[in-house]
């Protein structure tokens, strides 16, 4: 009991001697929390504003890319697909998207969606390399979502169009590793297809059979198995 009293006295004396210091520390902590909350609020508003802007741009792009469209999102007449007026409007949309994607953070809906819209525009133009790069950036921004699988898959398609089969194979593999991505069998089939394009028959056969073992009831797996059989019948060559 005596020791407890001594302890209480020591604490009281410490608080009395260092009261100003403790008050200063408390004020600093509260001020820091207030500043953090303020910064968080500002960032949240900026993200919401960027998301709304990207959504508006995406709607304008949807109107602009319609094959039978003769009127732009702003109501002005435009030339046919590929015309200078259409391209100029696409360039304007790209500039706005780049502004939305140039924020200090590199994740979240606004960044990923902006990069995906950039990729879609370049994909429509068949500018495969630029589209591929933008899809990869979109996948990074959406890395916590299954949507990343979609973006990696699209990036792989761009690499495939460019004849960059090794890049395409790697990107298809990335898409297949994304959790909850619904097109995993199709992505894995394309891994085998890229191995075939690279002339690696054994690797292609292995990829197709692994696909079949993982998803035996899937249509892509059945097609993969038939490709593996065709390679085997062809003596290690694609048929």
Curated annotation (Swiss-Prot):
Cell membrane keyword on record: yes
UniProt entry tagged with the keyword Phosphoprotein: no
Residues annotated as transmembrane: 21-43
InterPro entries: TPR-like_helical_dom_sf
Signal peptide: none
Keywords per UniProt: Cell membrane, Membrane, Repeat, TPR repeat, Transmembrane, Transmembrane helix
Membrane topology: Single-pass membrane protein
Database matches in Gene3D superfamilies: Tetratricopeptide repeat domain
Stated name of the protein: TPR repeat-containing protein TP_0282
Entry GO terms, CC: plasma membrane
TPR repeats by residue range: 112-145, 149-182
SUPFAM superfamilies: TPR-like
Domain of life: Bacteria
Main location: membrane
Subcellular localization: Cell membrane
């Amino acid at each position: 009991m005596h020791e407890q009293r001594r302890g209480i006295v020591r604490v009281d004396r410490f608080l009395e001697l260092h009261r100003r210091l403790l008050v200063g520390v408390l004020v600093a902590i509260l001020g820091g929390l207030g500043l953090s909350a303020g910064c968080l609020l500002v960032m949240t508003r900026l993200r919401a504003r960027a998301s709304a802007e990207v959504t508006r741009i995406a709607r304008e792009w949807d109107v602009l890319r319609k094959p039978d469209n003769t009127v732009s999102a702003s109501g002005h007449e435009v030339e046919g697909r590929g015309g200078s007026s259409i391209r100029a409007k696409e360039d304007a949309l790209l500039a706005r998207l780049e502004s939305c994607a140039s924020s200090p953070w590199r994740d979240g809906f606004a960044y990923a969606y902006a990069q995906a819209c950039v990729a879609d525009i370049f994909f429509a133009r068949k500018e495969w390399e630029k589209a591929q790069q933008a899809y990869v950036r979109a996948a990074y921004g959406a890395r916590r979502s299954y949507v990343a699988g979609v973006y990696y898959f699209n990036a792989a398609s761009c690499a495939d169009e460019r004849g960059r089969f090794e890049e395409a194979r790697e990107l298809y593999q990335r898409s297949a590793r994304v959790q909850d991505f619904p097109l995993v069998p199709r992505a894995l089939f394309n891994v085998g297809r890229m191995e075939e394009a690279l002339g690696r028959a054994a690797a292609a056969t292995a990829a197709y059979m692994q696909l079949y073992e993982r998803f035996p009831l899937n249509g892509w797996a059945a097609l993969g198995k038939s490709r593996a059989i065709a390679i085997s019948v062809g003596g290690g060559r694609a048929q």
